Structures are given as C-alpha cells and as structure tokens.
C-alpha cells in the first residue's frame, strides 16, 4: 500500500518535459558561439576544413556582415529580416543561427531559417535547385516491347 501512494501523487502532477540540448560533435551551442574560428574548424569535416584553410573571400564575409546588421536592427524577440544571397556554397557557422536567409536556387529565393542542426552544412543543401521528377506513364519507344504496340 505504501508503494502505491507515491505513484498516485506523481501521476497527479504533470511531468516536466525535458528537451534535448543541442551539441555539435560533443560541444554545446554556447561553447560553439564563444569558440574561435581556428578551434571551430577543427570540429568540421575534412572538406570544410580544406575550404576554411584556403581562406574566406570577400563575398562570404559580406553576407555575414549583412546578417549581423539584420540581427542588430531586429526588435527584441522578433525574427530578423531575410537577407538574400546567391552564395549557395556558403558554410553555415554558429554565428548565423537564428538568421533568415533567402538562398537563390536559380529561379527564386527560398527562405531558410538557420537552426543549430545546420552547422557545418552548405546553404545549397536547404534550397533545392531542381524539381524532383514525377514519373508518368512511359511513352512509345520507352521499352523494346513497346515498339510493337500500334499507334492510336
């Protein structure tokens, strides 16, 4: 009888929800934001390490500058204004988290909200540049046997 009472008391109180804390390769988000670029690059994959070792050109730095400005001008608690870019090969870094970027796919700008899970990926991965194929019925000549089907 003594075993049942704590269970009933616990059932009456709503259980607190616990959310998974984000970590990139074992490093939590706050530490990532404070980390220097050299330390951060060590956590990335070899392809991205190579890209950073070859140096950042003027274009990616200009995008980060625009993102900083958009975040600074946004009212507290509001999302920043979208920043449009053609830089599909830009690597997402922790500083970009929370920003909204319009990534050009060759036709339109797809708005992408940067989340912590996107760190270390390219912007292009979140803005598909082609329309996936929806296969219909095969046409005449699609297979060898379809040659003998008379045309209507």
From Swiss-Prot:
Q: Name one GO molecular function term.
A: structural constituent of ribosome
Q: One biological process GO term for this chain?
A: translation
**One Pfam family named in its UniProt record:** Ribosomal_S19
**Per its UniProt record, what PROSITE patterns does this chain match?**
RIBOSOMAL_S19
- Cellular location of this protein? Cytoplasm
Q: Per its UniProt record, what InterPro entries does this chain match? A: Ribosomal_uS19, Ribosomal_uS19_CS, Ribosomal_uS19_euk/arc, Ribosomal_uS19_SF
Question: Which SUPFAM superfamilies has this protein been placed in?
Answer: Ribosomal protein S19
Q: Which GO terms describe its cellular component?
A: cytosolic ribosome; cytosolic small ribosomal subunit; nucleolus; plant-type vacuole; plasma membrane; plasmodesma
Sorted keywords for this record are: Cytoplasm, Ribonucleoprotein, Ribosomal protein
Tell me which domain of life the UniProt entry assigns to the organism this sequence originates from: Eukaryota
Kindly report the protein's main subcellular placement as a broad class: cytoplasm
The reply to whether Ribosomal protein figures as a keyword in the UniProt entry is yes
Q: Give the UniProt family note.
A: Belongs to the universal ribosomal protein uS19 family.
Its recorded name reads: Small ribosomal subunit protein uS19x
Source species taxonomy: Eukaryota, Viridiplantae, Streptophyta, Embryophyta, Tracheophyta
**Designated gene of the protein:** RPS15D
